[in-house]
Regions:
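Conserved loop-alpha-helix segment in the C-terminal half of the alpha/beta-hydrolase fold
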Residues: 231-273
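Catalytic active-site module of serine/aspartate enzymes centered on a nucleophile-bearing elbow/loop
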Residues: 264-299
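Flexible "cap/lid" loop of the alpha/beta hydrolase fold
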Residues: 126-167
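Active-site loop/oxyanion-hole signature of alpha/beta-hydrolase fold enzymes
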Residues: 63-109, 287
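Alpha/beta-hydrolase
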Residues: 160-239
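Conserved hydrolase catalytic core segment
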Residues: 100-143
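N-terminal cap/lid segment of alpha/beta-hydrolase-fold proteins
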Residues: 2-21
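Conserved HGGG/HGGXW glycine-rich cap/lid loop of the alpha/beta-hydrolase fold
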Residues: 20-74, 79
């Protein structure tokens, strides 16, 4: 971890979550309203260091590495891990760091975990923001099908053709998947250092525990994500909520579901952005997020 060159206070350490040590990093004044960040991947928190942009605007940002990720504990087995356990870990970080009622932010897979934590502990958080997140396995699978169906023919047809016959290792399938990833998921010609660093840490054992042996983009999940559905829980939530996505990513479809199921939520999509709008349209992204956070703090 690079040393802190910021004029703002930074602390790092560990909290205990059901017997597992989870690494955290905090940047900003301890008296400032806190934003608790849940990363995707499953990789580590570093690619979301861009949210440090919130600190000069009066916020404290707290990141942590999930179980099996980054500098947190890497168990030999994820047999006892689940969406609910991951949600409880979010609450453990909040409670042990004495964050009060922080704003909760989750991206991608972390968006799903943030939603899970909010449903389990609705009184623990001041607000909820998801970016490219999803609220059920069915929504995730449906979104991927819609996304692939809407891709240009040169990308779509090799994916669909090879998926139908299970030819996931073919040259044309892998080339089409790489194109989809580069253009419609990452959306960046040059990967920022923090994103590349996080990408190199993806825990494949944990990914397998979540999704199972899912060979293709359109394959159903067979891990502990299978059958997961927060729809009814979200409909009961009464929490200021912001739902974000790019307009060319699969997450735009799951964002619509989250928005529809979350009472009173606000949906914002970033034109031309893929799965990482905080890199692609950074100024606009921060403007939208700050406006939302400040409106909640004023209310």
């Amino acid at each position: 971890m690079p040393r802190n060159l910021s004029p703002y206070p930074e602390t790092q350490g560990y909290v205990d979550a059901e017997g597992s040590r989870l690494f955290y990093r905090s940047l900003g004044n301890l008296t400032s309203p806190a934003v608790l960040v849940v990363h995707g991947g499953p990789s580590d928190h570093r690619y979301l260091s861009v949210l440090a942009d919130l600190v000069p605007n009066g916020y404290r940002v707290v990141w942590y590495d999930q179980l099996g990720c980054g500098r947190s504990r890497h168990p030999r087995s994820f047999r006892d891990y689940s969406m609910e356990a991951a949600g409880r870990h979010v609450e453990a970080v909040r409670r042990q760091l004495r964050l009060g009622r922080p704003h909760l932010f989750g991206h991608s897979w972390g968006g799903a975990l943030a939603l899970q934590a909010a449903v389990l502990f609705p009184r623990s958080f001041r607000s909820l923001t998801t970016c490219g997140g999803f609220a059920s396995e069915a929504s995730f699978q449906r979104a991927m099908r819609q996304h692939v169906h809407g891709l240009p023919r040169a990308v779509r047809e090799p994916i669909e053709r090879n998926e139908r016959v299970g030819r996931y290792g073919s040259v044309e399938y892998r080339a089409a998947v790489r194109t989809r990833q580069r253009v419609y998921s990452t959306g960046l010609r040059v990967l920022p250092y923090d994103f590349a660093a996080s990408l190199s840490t993806v825990n494949r054992r944990l990914r397998r525990a979540i999704y199972g042996d899912r060979p293709g983009l359109l394959s159903p999940a067979t891990g502990f994500l299978q059958g997961w559905d927060l729809q009814s829980g979200l409909r009961r939530l009464r929490m200021p909520s912001l739902v974000l996505s790019g307009t060319i990513e699969a997450g735009r479809y799951t964002a619509r579901d989250v928005h529809r199921w979350l009472p009173g939520s606000r949906l914002v999509t970033f034109a031309g952005a893929a799965h990482l709008p905080f890199y692609q349209v950074r100024d606009r992204f921060m403007e939208v997020l700050l406006t939302f956070l400040r409106s909640v703090d004023r209310s």
